[in-house]
Amino acid sequence: MLVTAYLAFVGLLASCLGLELSRCRAKPPGRACSNPSFLRFQLDFYQVYFLALAADWLQAPYLYKLYQHYYFLEGQIAILYVCGLASTVLFGLVASSLVDWLGRKNSCVLFSLTYSLCCLTKLSQDYFVLLVGRALGGLSTALLFSAFEAWYIHEHVERHDFPAEWIPATFARAAFWNHVLAVVAGVAAEAVASWIGLGPVAPFVAAIPLLALAGALALRNWGENYDRQRAFSRTCAGGLRCLLSDRRVLLLGTIQALFESVIFIFVFLWTPVLDPHGAPLGIIFSSFMAASLLGSSLYRIATSKRYHLQPMHLLSLAVLIVVFSLFMLTFSTSPGQESPVESFIAFLLIELACGLYFPSMSFLRRKVIPETEQAGVLNWFRVPLHSLACLGLLVLHDSDRKTGTRNMFSICSAVMVMALLAVVGLFTVVRHDAELRVPSPTEEPYAPEL
């Protein structure tokens, strides 16, 4: 398993590098890329945002392993994950209103503080302290995926008066470097935890200086901005009306809830499936992120002028790949007949599918959901998404360890078949909808929501 992990990592990294180099040679420079003021503004944003992302990714490979290291049972670990998911959905519902009320810069600084506290709780072996840490992690995640983007968009348009058409360029570049940071973070986590031998808590301690630096740079370099608050009840009511009045929105929300709930369960299960076979968790995680980056690169190539595939086609392909991968996992995790290499390949295919799924979903969501109602509609998407994931983890918590993992993958397979049926329904509804087609080469940003 050790050799397989390193070979896969090197191979995926080489593939990604080759695709990105060919894309960069073929892509003409844009006007925004040569504007010195815009580049300075981008740099001020990236310095803080990339530090925050790096700190987040650094913790991912060893979270489950840390709880195992503290001798918690799988059911207890499942409850910790459920607590994190529940806090994410609760804080996510009010994150936009909270950010508007506190101010975007203040919210980014608050993120640095709460996430640092979350990391500090990992030093404790007390179960209640770890539950509090998971709740803080949920708040931090909600702030990470709302405050930073809101601050940038307001500053870009209102303070600097740059063209709104340049905003996607910033987030497309951020999406690429987010993947790169995730790959590097996995290797760094492996280095401090395993190579140096500091143990599974080391990546969490290493994340704290990055978070402190991100908060300090935001305080020093960023201006504050606020926005007019819209009542939370009005936001949700408007989102519900949009959801019920447009079948496309309802089907898209169903696909998102089913697909991403399965991905949340995958995040929980990959460590207990591979770790008993001596897998280097940091390198495994970096391989996952490289596979996702490869999928994102393939999305850009597929939607280019040369191939001109549509996001709807790639969304269908992503769901099909995950269905196939989950069927593989139901066999590779059979008690007494485990095949870790086959499971690893299936996990890589799931991550590749994520690289196709997220930019496709992002494109379709922006086209289908009115901009004024996106926050409200997304709130309604999050509730079933996280509820399904929590339910799945609780089912695993109550099952026998030897058969529970395989049963969970079987359930996930059934869920993804339902998602595939929803994709077929959406495809039937939108097949003649020109609005959902890419008319020219596009560079859709990938914004990971897990």
UniProtKB/Swiss-Prot annotation:
Summary of the tissues where the protein is detected: Expressed ubiquitously but at relatively higher levels in the olfactory bulb and the skeletal muscle.
Gene3D superfamilies: MFS general substrate transporter like domains (1.20.1250.20)
Residue stretches spanning the membrane: 1-21, 43-63, 79-99, 128-148, 174-194, 195-215, 249-269, 278-298, 311-331, 344-364, 376-396, 409-429
One GO cellular component, as annotated: membrane
Function text: Mediates high-affinity intracellular uptake of the rare oligo-element molybdenum.
Principal location: membrane
Gene Ontology terms describing biological process: molybdate ion transport; monoatomic ion transport
Alphabetical list of InterPro entries matching this protein: MFS_trans_sf, MOT2/MFSD5
Domain of life according to the entry: Eukaryota
Keyword Cytoplasm on entry: no
The protein, known as: Molybdate-anion transporter
PANTHER family according to UniProt: MOLYBDATE-ANION TRANSPORTER, SAM (S-ADENOSYL METHIONINE) TRANSPORTER
Membrane topology: Multi-pass membrane protein
Subcellular location: Cell membrane
Family: Belongs to the major facilitator superfamily.
GO molecular function: molybdate ion transmembrane transporter activity
A Pfam family the protein falls into: MFS_5
Keywords, comma-separated and alphabetical: Cell membrane, Ion transport, Membrane, Transmembrane, Transmembrane helix, Transport
